[in-house]
Amino acid sequence: MNNSLWSDALYRLSRNRAAMFGGFILILLIICAALAPWIAPYSYSYQNLSLGASPPSADYLLGTDVLGRDLLSRILYGARISLLVGFVATGVALIIGVSWGIIAGYIGGRVDSIMMRIVDILYGLPFIIFIILLMVIFGRNLWLLFGAIGAVEWLTMARIVRGQVIGLKNQEFVMAAKAMGVSNISMFRRHLLPNILGPIAVYATLTIPQVMLLEGFLSFLGLGIQPPMSSWGTLIKDGVESMEEFSWLLIYPGITFTITLFALNFFGDGLRDALDPKT
C-alpha cells in the first residue's frame, strides 16, 4: 500500500467511533499491563492465608483467592502474560498463514494442491501432542509456548488468504499488472496485500482471545504458565472451579476478558472497513 492509501485508511479509522473506543481500551489495558509492578497493590505471589477467599473489601478491592492472593493484582500481572501470548502467537500465525495462503493461491495448480493437502493433514493432528513434543525436545520456555500456539493457529488464516487471493488474481487490475510485467513481489505488495488486509485484521482480532483461552487450557495441563504466575486464562479456569462458593473469582477476570474481547472486535471491524480499498 502506498502512503496515500495508508493515510486514507488512518482517516477512515479515526472517524469510526467504535473502533477508536476499542483502540483506547486496548491501549489502556496494555499500559496497565506494562505498569503492573508499580500500580498493582500487591505482588502477584503475595499471600495472606488468614484472608483466603475473602470477598471484595477496602484492602482487597476485588477480593482474594483461596490462597489469600489479591485478585486485582493477579489480573494486572496476568494481563502481561495474556496480552503477550495473544499478540505474539497471533503474529506468528499471521506471518505463517498469510505467506502460505498467498503462495498457494497465487501459484495455484499442483503447488496449491500439495500445500493445501498439508494444511488438511495438519488440521487432523492433535495440537496438544505437537506442543508436548516441542516442550520435550526444547524444554519448557515461555517464548516457545507462544510460538507453538501460533504454529497451530495459522491453518485457518492460510485458507482465508488463499481464497481471497484466488478471487483476486483473475481480476482485471491484476491481469493488467501481469501484462505490464509487474514482478511477483510488487504484485503481492501493491495489488494483493492491500485487498486482503481487511479479512486479515478481522481474523487477527478473533484469534487473540482464542489463544488467550488456549494458553489457560495448556496451563491447566501443566504445559503453560505455572504458579504462582497467572494469566487471564488460568484465573478464569480457577474461577470456574470455585464459582459456586466464591463467585468473584470468576466474575472479575471474566469481565476483564469480555471487555478485551469487545474492544478487539470493535477495533478489528474498524480496521476491516478502513483497510478496504473499495470504501
Regions found by a protein language model. Name each.
Residues L61, D65, L71, I95, ...:
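Generic hydrophobic transmembrane alpha-helix motif, especially the helices
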Residues M135-I137, I149, Q164-V165, L206, ...:
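Glycine-rich helix-loop "coupling/hinge" segments at transmembrane-helix boundaries
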Residues R80, L122, P126, M135, ...:
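Residue-level hotspots within pore-lining transmembrane alpha-helices
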Residues A36-Y44, G105-G109, L134-R140, V152, ...:
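Short helix-capping/hinge motifs at transmembrane helix termini and TM-loop junctions
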